[in-house]
């Protein structure tokens, strides 16, 4: 949906298509907040439309900060690291598994580099890796009142979820807690279904290859 369509659909949900109660500005604000809510609550696997890449980032001793790389990934969403030095995808490792990297069979090598994120810094092993491409999740672009004709950046399957959260916000502003809670529960239930499904389908192991 475009922002215009989302605004119109939200007006129908709120029983206010003429915008006599909820202004375009209030609905646009609610949509913007809701897009971020969806991005923050869903697994990265559903957010490929928000993926960006920055090429040829130089590392110092295998480390570079988000700010140094010129990126602002939403909730630390690094989805892949490509080792340009050795032409290999890094295996992404969660911080809870870092202790296991002390095992020589699991530590990063030039043929099997590993990467992890800690305190807004990207760490790559072996530290001889000098150049990487970083794939990350960016924030959705806010709509601006009076210029909402662009397509929503999120996957089309998530647009109704955005509207559920936006509807909940606006009913709450209108002092209708029951209707707000109903819309919010609909959104949370769908988030749970989607995340539970992804947990079943995603690869297992101490790390997964980027991309």
Segments the model singles out, each with a brief description of its role:
Residues 1-211:
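Glycine-enriched, solvent-exposed interface loops adjoining structured elements
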């Amino acid at each position: 949906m475009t922002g215009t369509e989302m605004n119109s659909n939200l007006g129908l949900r709120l029983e206010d298509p003429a915008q006599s109660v909820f202004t375009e500005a209030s609905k646009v604000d609610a949509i913007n907040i809701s897009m971020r809510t969806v991005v923050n609550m869903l697994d990265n696997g559903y957010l490929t439309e928000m993926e960006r890449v920055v090429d040829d980032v130089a590392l110092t001793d295998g480390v570079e900060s988000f700010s140094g790389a010129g990126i602002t990934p939403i909730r630390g969403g690094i989805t892949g690291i490509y080792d340009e030095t050795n032409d290999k995808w890094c295996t992404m490792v969660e911080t809870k598994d870092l202790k296991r990297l002390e095992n020589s069979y699991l530590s990063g090598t030039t043929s099997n580099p590993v990467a992890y994120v800690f305190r807004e810094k990207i760490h790559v092993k072996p530290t001889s890796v000098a150049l990487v491409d970083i794939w990350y999740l960016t924030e959705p672009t806010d709509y601006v009142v009076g210029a909402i004709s662009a397509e929503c950046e999120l996957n089309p399957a998530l647009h109704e979820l955005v509207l559920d959260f936006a509807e909940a916000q606006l009913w709450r502003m209108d002092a209708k807690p029951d209707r707000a809670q109903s819309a919010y529960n609909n959104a949370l239930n769908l988030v749970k279904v989607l995340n539970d499904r992804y947990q079943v389908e995603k690869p297992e192991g101490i790390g997964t290859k980027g991309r």
